[in-house]
Amino acid sequence: MSFDSNLEELYQKFCKLKSILEDPSQLSVDSFVAASKEYSELLPVISVIDQYNSLQKDIADLEELINNPETDHELKSLAKEEFYERQKQLPKIKNKLKLSLIPKDRDDARNAILEIRAGTGGEEAALFVTDLYRMYTKYAEQKNWKFEQINSSSTGIGGHKEVSLCISGSNVFARLKFESGVHRVQRVPETEASGRLHTSAATVAVLPEIEEVDLKIDEKDLRIDVYRSSGPGGQSVNTTDSAVRITHIPSGIVVIQQDEKSQHKNKNKALKVLRARLYNLEKQKRDSEISQMRKSQIGSGDRSERIRTYNFPQSRITDHRINLTLYRLEDIMKEGNLDEFIDALIAEDEANKLKNLHI
């Protein structure tokens, strides 16, 4: 199907939706909501199609004027100038149109649950988790996003085996989703007398936060265990059974929450994480090209699987997916200035989606 045929088909679909919505009495509530949503999503695309069609018509009219033997010389000269000017605008509006046709990720507007776990590298990996946590919270502050720590497991000397947080604000998931994967760090540990460079890793998973109304979990599918929370080294830090472990029996997903002193708060936080993981699992099943299985998304923590490398001696960060290297490690890690990486990853994603449009 040609580019213009695709646009015509889309326009016809829009007109049909408009006609349906003008007589809502024929629709059920659910059908009306679905049609309204689709209509709203098409509106900005139709606006660009109108611009494109108007430009095409102008070009055709000018061409007809130029080729008309009755057109006087002066008018023909002006028409040619206008014709070439409009022709130059065509690729730009066509590209704008293609970008508007890229399928939108409906999760982009959602808040995100960010999980960071230590991979290979022992204590160095745990310290790197803390570094990444600081980097992302600084980035959230820059964007005026709110964040709340959901769970953490510290090593007692500044590192974390894992830490998770919920980040809320405008387009959080859209900007953070490409952070999922294995992050590798290369640096000389403070305790390393010989000055030998160590390589360790941490895994990052970014999941869209799912509201309870969006995903219902059947209580009978859950096994909920409560116990006393523990701190570093396993010692008990609470005299009541406030820690919660929820197992989703059909999927085998287990969520542990013990940061709060209240069992009720821990349960609510654990359910929030469980909803996000279950939604992510379903999303992966629906479209394996957009999202791989969770284990594939975050990797095993092996040093060989990495999306980004942080080299401290060279003050260098390299994103291996887009071959982008920046020599601003401290600025990025301590101040959270991640936009250059994130903007480049979004642009790369859009370019890849454009290739797959086949128009």
Swiss-Prot record:
Major localization listed first in the record, in broad terms: cytoplasm
Protein name, entry field: Peptide chain release factor 1
Classification lineage: Bacteria, Pseudomonadati, Pseudomonadota, Alphaproteobacteria, Rickettsiales
Biased composition (Polar residues): 290-299
Function: Peptide chain release factor 1 directs the termination of translation in response to the peptide chain termination codons UAG and UAA.
GO molecular function: translation release factor activity, codon specific
Changes after translation: Methylated by PrmC. Methylation increases the termination efficiency of RF1.
Region (Disordered): 285-305
SUPFAM superfamilies on file: Release factor
N5-methylglutamine carried by residues: 235
Compartments where found: Cytoplasm
GO cellular component: cytoplasm
Family indicated by similarity: Belongs to the prokaryotic/mitochondrial release factor family.
Record keywords, A-Z: Cytoplasm, Methylation, Protein biosynthesis
